[in-house]
């Protein structure tokens, strides 16, 4: 039994499932999760000292790679001034100034502690601002673990929400309408049925929790038009895509303007930070200037703000996003070429610094139902074959992979070579 296995056995007696977030338990792929000792650049080192090329990146935040010296130094300096004050700081102002300068649709922003807090707060704000209760989300999209968002879709294009987890009252879920991602007709049907009751649409502009599903041409723009037509707000959940597919987020990349935007992951530079923001008239409805309540003891934490500010300044440089996209393109093309050589049917979706690997003979993967038709068992085998060769992919067929600026062409080539070897064993 190695150290990770020993730690996992101990953890299971103290922490539910041995982990503090379910996907880390390797439930989707089987086996024992790695316990990580340290990380640097594009590499993780487990409790037994084995190194891995990392494509999880702490589930998205590590766009600069692990333990980046600029972020590390900023955090050390901030810690020296105090861990938390419970009062406003200049860094909060500087951070808000930077974020609103980078995201064109955000006139104002409020900091929170996680992506879940950001989406939960944005939806409350949308409901309060519009005076309506219902919201539209999309099958296969994840927006955190707030009660009204843990909803699954039933049959048909339009489904009144049913709880997706015990502990979520049906009365909470009934206001959540689930439509099909990349299917505007399902959204039109929802608005036709509830024309005066829908407060908002919330959408991942690139769906990253059914692996990686980009929007079809016109999909996001169609959502914008429907919101305008029916007086609803468009919330773009950029917790995953913000500062990853483009400096101005996926909304810049796909040229769509939301009313509210949710941010997380990269905005914290590896620290727990979320944010939501948007049109001034909507944001000013928040307390203390407006009646809609939202608060947080550690929101705008000075250490977290220092990390996020340092990270955003580092990526706000010429050439960063072309470099990130080139690395991702090279990986995707190499994986597809290796799969063709070994006659393994494969689709690789990728946008900016995100990618998704699908074992399928479908020509494309564009929605949740397409994802369900992929070969999850083959992915499990592939994951472990890659792990044995020192390549750490997301331990789930439903999670996107992430590139960092710390990955080298040598890392990419090693990954492609490992994939070729793995594909040969999957026949």
Swiss-Prot record:
Its EC number is 5.4.3.8. Its main location: cytoplasm. The modification N6-(pyridoxal phosphate)lysine is found at residue 265. One of its GO terms (biological process) is protoporphyrinogen IX biosynthetic process. Keywords: Cytoplasm, Isomerase, Porphyrin biosynthesis, Pyridoxal phosphate. Pathway: Porphyrin-containing compound metabolism; protoporphyrin-IX biosynthesis; 5-aminolevulinate from L-glutamyl-tRNA(Glu): step 2/2. It comes from the Bacteria. The keyword Isomerase applies. Homodimer. PANTHER family: GLUTAMATE-1-SEMIALDEHYDE 2,1-AMINOMUTASE, GLUTAMATE-1-SEMIALDEHYDE 2,1-AMINOMUTASE 1, CHLOROPLASTIC-RELATED. Belongs to the class-III pyridoxal-phosphate-dependent aminotransferase family. HemL subfamily. This is Glutamate-1-semialdehyde 2,1-aminomutase.
């Amino acid at each position: 039994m190695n150290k990770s296995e020993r730690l996992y056995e101990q953890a299971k007696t103290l922490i539910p499932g041995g982990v503090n977030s379910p996907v880390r338990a390797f439930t989707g792929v089987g086996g024992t999760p790695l316990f990580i000792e340290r990380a640097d650049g594009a590499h993780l080192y487990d409790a037994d000292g084995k190194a891995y090329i990392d494509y999880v990146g702490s589930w998205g935040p590590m766009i600069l790679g692990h333990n980046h010296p600029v972020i590390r130094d900023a955090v050390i300096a901030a810690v020296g001034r105090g861990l938390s004050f419970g009062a406003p700081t200049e860094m909060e102002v500087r951070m808000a100034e930077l974020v609103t300068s980078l995201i064109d649709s955000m006139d104002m922003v409020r900091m929170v502690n996680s992506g879940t807090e950001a989406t939960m707060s944005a939806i409350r704000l949308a409901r309060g601002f519009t005076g309506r209760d219902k919201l539209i989300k999309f099958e296969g999209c994840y927006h955190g673990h707030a009660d009204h968002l843990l909803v699954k879709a039933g049959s048909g294009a339009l489904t009144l929400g049913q709880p997706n987890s015990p502990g979520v009252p049906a009365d909470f879920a009934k206001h959540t309408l689930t439509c099909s991602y990349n299917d505007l007709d399902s959204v039109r049907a929802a608005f036709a049925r509830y024309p005066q009751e829908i407060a908002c649409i919330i959408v991942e502009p690139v769906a990253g929790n059914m692996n990686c599903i980009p929007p079809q041409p016109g999909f996001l723009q169609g959502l914008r038009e429907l919101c305008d037509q029916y007086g609803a707000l468009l919330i773009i959940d950029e917790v995953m895509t913000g500062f990853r597919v483009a400096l101005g987020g996926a909304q810049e990349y796909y040229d769509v303007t939301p009313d509210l935007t949710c941010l997380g992951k990269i905005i914290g530079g590896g620290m727990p930070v979320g944010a939501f923001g948007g049109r001034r008239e909507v944001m000013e409805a928040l307390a203390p200037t407006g009646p809609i309540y939202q608060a947080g003891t550690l929101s705008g934490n000075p250490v977290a703000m220092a990390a996020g500010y340092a990270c955003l300044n580092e990526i706000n440089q010429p050439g960063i996003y072309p470099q990130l996209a080139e690395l991702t393109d090279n990986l995707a093309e190499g994986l597809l070429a290796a799969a063709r050589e070994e006659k393994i049917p494969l689709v690789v979706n990728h946008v900016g610094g995100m990618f998704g690997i699908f074992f399928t003979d479908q020509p494309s993967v564009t929605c949740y139902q397409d994802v369900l038709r992929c070969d999850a068992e083959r992915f499990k085998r592939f994951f472990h074959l890659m792990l044995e060769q020192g390549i750490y992919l997301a331990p789930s067929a439903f999670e996107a992979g992430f590139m960092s600026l710390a990955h080298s062409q040598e890392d990419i080539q090693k990954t492609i070579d490992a994939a070729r070897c793995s594909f040969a064993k999957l026949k």
